[in-house]
Swiss-Prot record:
GO terms for cellular component: GMP reductase complex. Homotetramer. This is GMP reductase 2. It holds the Pfam family IMPDH. PANTHER family: GMP REDUCTASE, GMP REDUCTASE 2. HAMAP family: GMP_reduct_type1 (MF_00596). K(+) binds at G181, G183, C186, R189. GO terms for biological process: GMP metabolic process; purine nucleobase metabolic process. The gene is GMPR2. NADP(+) binds at residues 26-27, 78, 129-131, 180-181, 269, 285-286, 314-317. Catalyzes the irreversible NADPH-dependent deamination of GMP to IMP. It functions in the conversion of nucleobase, nucleoside and nucleotide derivatives of G to A nucleotides, and in maintaining the intracellular balance of A and G nucleotides. Plays a role in modulating cellular differentiation. It catalyses: IMP + NH4(+) + NADP(+) = GMP + NADPH + 2 H(+). It comes from Bos taurus. Keywords: Acetylation, Metal-binding, NADP, Oxidoreductase, Potassium, Purine metabolism.
Length: 348
């Protein structure tokens, strides 16, 4: 029977954070570092929990080199060869604790993952990524990976509801990726009509995960540092970024020059371009669920990282959180009809 859930569900654009009294004198006093103990792997994480998405135009080795300097994390895309992994690991051993090896559910993906983790034991994180994390096949795959790698920390997704977060955690995942359709180059909501507003998804999934001592990643939907802060305020343990990290020197994607301006290609991993590149084209039984865009070239990603980190520090001072850990406890969202005045920009 069709059913309508009449509860209001909200996105990042629908809210602002209410400022609160603070004893902080400076943004520099804010500690953005988090430490987590993972439920199933029993491993520890320490760092600033922002993750470059496992897209071949974002989650590159070049990106990982820069992000690890800031104690940020990279989910490296799955299309690097074993030899490329070995070369990177030998030249950048300090980065290995701040990255994950990614895999789909295919047998060739799993074989590649096994080879990487066996060859480079310092890599302790695995990112199991499918568009639809609700399939029984995916749940069984997570169980198999947990059985094969009992001491690796497993990220798995994507889902948007509490019951599936619980299912994946109980199946062996440590960190659940939350988000269906919010990404800037994702067209799943248009092609399928399926999705969930990201802010509400994060709040509900965080509640489910934390009850089991699990963790979540807010994956997608952030277009500015304020959105990243809102995701943390809503209870996300990690925030994964794609579009915000696209278009840089360290990003993948072809560099294009037109009329004296530089652009970089950025595309979803379910887009026609990605499927042509890695699968020989779009299979007859499926539709492309991503698009390709040209992002104005932004230069070195270091400047963007500083902007994001600076924004979150400022958020913490506005709400009186001396540590990022306190941000969700200090968060009160207010519903709004307008975020910014769009007089001098295209923002709305």
């Amino acid at each position: 029977m069709p059913h309508i859930d009449n509860d209001v569900k909200l996105d990042f654009k629908d809210v602002l954070l209410r400022p609160k009294r603070s004893t902080l004198k400076s943004r520099s006093e804010v500690d953005l570092t988090r430490s987590f103990a993972f439920r199933n792997s029993k491993q520890m994480y320490t760092g600033i929990p922002i993750i470059a998405a496992n897209m071949d135009t974002v989650g590159t080795f070049e990106m990982a080199k820069v992000l690890c300097k800031f104690s940020l994390f990279t989910a490296v895309h799955k299309h690097y060869s074993l030899e490329q992994w070995k070369e990177f690991a030998s030249q950048n051993p300090d980065c290995l604790e701040h990255l994950a090896a990614s895999s789909g559910t295919g047998s060739s993906d799993f074989e590649q993952l096994e080879q990487i983790l066996n060859a480079i034991p310092q890599v302790k994180y695995v990112c199991l990524d499918v568009a639809n994390g609700y399939s029984e096949h995916f749940v069984e795959f997570v169980k198999d990976v947990r059985k094969r790698f009992p001491e690796h920390t497993i990220m798995a997704g994507n889902v948007v509801t509490g019951e599936m977060v619980e299912e994946l955690i109980l199946s062996g995942a440590d960190i659940i990726k939350v988000g269906i359709g919010p990404g800037s180059v994702c067209t799943t909501r248009k092609k399928t009509g399926v999705g969930y507003p990201q802010l509400s998804a994060v709040m509900e999934c965080a509640d489910a995960a934390h009850g089991l001592k699990g963790h979540i990643i807010s994956d997608g939907g952030c277009s500015c540092p304020g959105d990243v802060a809102k995701a943390f305020g809503a209870g996300a343990d990690f925030v994964m970024l794609g579009g915000m990290l696209a278009g840089h020197s360290e990003s993948g994607g072809e560099l294009i020059e037109r009329n004296g301006r530089k652009y970089k290609l950025f595309y979803g991993m379910s887009s026609e371009m990605a499927m042509k590149k890695y699968a020989g084209g779009v299979a007859e039984y499926r539709a492309s669920e991503g698009k390709t865009v040209e992002v104005p070239f932004k230069g070195d990603v270091e400047h963007t990282i500083r902007d994001i980190i600076g924004g979150i520090r400022s958020t913490c001072t506005y709400v009186g959180a001396a540590k990022q850990k306190e941000l969700s406890r200090r968060t009160t969202f207010i519903r709004v009809t307008q975020q910014v005045k769009p007089i001098f920009s295209d923002e709305s």
